[in-house]
Swiss-Prot record:
Catalyzes the liberation of maltose from 1,4-alpha-D glucans. The gene is BMY1. Sequence repeats lie at residues 489-499, 500-510, 511-521, 522-532. Residues 489-532 are annotated as: 4 X 11 AA tandem repeats. This is Beta-amylase. The active site is at 184 (proton donor), 378 (proton acceptor).
Length: 535
């Protein structure tokens, strides 16, 4: 029976602390981390996830890479017998409420921004966001002769060359490619550092000169050179109904509105496609999986305009699937989706935010599965209680355990936010160990489960028109059981979720979505809907 049940095994990873490598690019916490990894091994965890910060490794100058601290960290992980998910973190960590560390993008890159501030994403007020370079400079050779995409490709190439021993040994199994703020493929539409607070709709962030020029050219090409960016979409903390653009039957449904939203979201998809193509060339032939992070923007999901998703770049409506288009692009690169909110229940949310994390998770996971992708998830808040774990288990195997083989749909893996002493002590540790057992279908840890094949070359380039065919018709998600059939103990209680957001795809505070590598969720997400004044 065990052979048949083995197909139900879902791998479990744990995000390492943000300061696993210090802000001065040193590995200084070896003894502490060694003890924590020992506890993870005892719990049966399959591996760990770590941010590999661009701002640390290439901080001293163009191509002046220093991988020494990360090599020491990776050696420790290897000796523990754990696998490793490495995040190419091209974004800033820090600068928001709850951030434990501050790691900006390289100073020499920011220096280019003092001469040309349009290298940064810019809102309609002219405020620059220095977390991540605008996709408008993807192909602009502004950085000592290199474009942004070339810098990212060179960084990944240097990583491959310096970490070859860990790639060859099968220690590194996942390369998660950062594509935006918090490492997520999105625009920085809801920055707390610029005054956004949950559940604001956010703003369109495309006012740098490079994206403005691109839009003007695109509008002229369809015979509307007079079209400009929306001027009725409100401000960061508006609700949809306070704006002409997002209200019911608003501007977003007009020809001009649809054109803008398509341009805005298509640019994001093309940005991901460009960088994943480079990542594929870099890691071609290695036994790794490429992955990207998609942000879990669950607030205003229940209103027709899906306003907060639209400002982030996800063109998702009741009759248009904004996530399957992304999945269609990823299919070309055989890349996986990493999504968040896996522990959240609608019943835990504020009614005023019109939030629906369960429906959102089901839509995104279904989109990935329909495109034949491996799909992974994270929790958004560091929760330790059976209620959260059981929600994750339900999402991991929507139809429950299949006694006769692999389920039709299941997560490829789950990454827990985040490693801390609080996780590996007392009842929290007991609950976590039980959770890992349940994710493994009560089977022993298997380091050889889901073996990686050599990464093949990306498929032929797909036109944006072909990608957009995935948007319609918008199909219903696959059915999900209400409860897991393999629960962790008694349910009830919130059991210790974090108050307020913490850090991004390994490091930024970004409110309500969780990060690929580890930020926490907005405090209203799973805390009964209270909106603290600090937000």
């Amino acid at each position: 029976m065990e052979v048949n049940v083995k197909g139900n095994y879902v791998q479990v990873y744990v995000m390492l602390p943000l300061d696993a490598v210090s802000v001065n690019n040193r590995f200084e916490k070896g003894d502490e981390l060694r003890a924590q990894l020992r506890k993870l091994v005892e719990a049966g965890v399959d591996g760990v996830m770590v941010d590999v910060w661009w701002g640390l490794v290439e901080g001293k100058g163009p191509k002046a890479y220093d991988w020494s601290a990360y090599k020491q960290l990776f050696e420790l992980v290897q000796k523990a017998g754990l696998k490793l998910q490495a995040i190419m973190s091209f974004h800033q960590c820090g600068g928001n409420v709850g951030d434990a560390v501050n790691i900006p993008i390289p100073q020499w890159v920011r220096d280019v921004g003092t001469r040309d501030p349009d290298i940064f994403y810019t809102d309609g007020h002219g405020t620059r966001n220095i977390e991540y370079l605008t996709l408008g400079v993807d192909n602009q050779p502004l950085f000592h002769g290199r474009s942004a995409v070339q810098m990212y490709a060179d960084y990944m190439t240097s990583f491959r060359e310096n970490m070859k021993e860990f790639l060859d040994a099968g220690v590194i199994v996942d390369i998660e490619v950062g594509l935006g703020p918090a490492g997520e493929m999105r625009y920085p539409s809801y920055p707390q550092s610029h005054g956004w607070s949950f559940p604001g709709i956010g703003e369109f962030i495309c006012y740098d000169k490079y994206l403005q020029a691109d839009f003007k050219a695109a509008a002229a090409a369809v015979g509307h050179p007079e079209w400009e960016f929306p001027n009725d979409a409100g401000q960061y903390n508006d609700t949809p109904e306070r704006t002409q653009f997002f209200r019911d039957n608003g501007t977003y449904l007009t020809e001009k509105g649809r054109f803008f939203l398509a341009w805005y979201s298509n640019n994001l998809i093309k940005h991901g496609d460009r960088i994943l193509d480079e990542a594929n060339k870099v890691f071609l032939g290695y036994k790794v999986q490429l992955a990207i992070k998609i942000s879990g923007i669950h607030w205003w999901y229940k209103v027709p305009s899906h306003a907060a998703e639209l400002t982030a770049g996800y063109y998702n409506l009741h009759d248009r699937d904004g996530y399957r288009t992304i999945a269609r692009m990823l299919k070309r690169h055989r890349a996986s989706i990493n999504f968040t909110c896996a522990e959240m229940r609608d019943s835990e949310q504020s009614s005023q935010a019109m939030s629906a994390p369960e429906e959102l998770v089901q839509q995104v996971l279904s989109a990935g599965w329909r495109e034949g992708l491996n799909v992974a998830c994270e929790n958004a808040l560091p929760r330790y209680d059976p209620t959260a774990y059981n929600t994750i288990l339900r999402n991991a195997r929507p139809h429950g355990i299949n006694q006769s083989g692999p389920p039709e749909h299941k997560l490829f893996g789950f990454t827990y936010l985040r490693l801390s002493n609080q996780l590996v002590e007392g009842q929290n540790y007991v609950n976590f160990k039980t959770f890992v057992d349940r994710m493994h279908a009560n089977l022993p840890r298997d380091p050889y489960v889901d073996p990686m094949a050599p990464l093949p070359r990306s498929g032929p380039e797909i036109s944006i028109e072909m990608i957009l065919q995935a948007a319609k018709p918008k199909l219903q998600p696959f059915p999900f059981q209400e409860h897991t059939d393999l629960p962790v103990g008694p349910t009830g209680g919130m059991g210790g979720q974090a108050e307020g957001p913490t850090c991004g795809m390994g490091g930024q505070v970004k409110g309500p979505t969780g990060g690929m590598g580890g930020q926490a969720e907005d405090p209203t997400s799973g805390m009964g809907g209270e909106l603290p004044a600090t937000m």
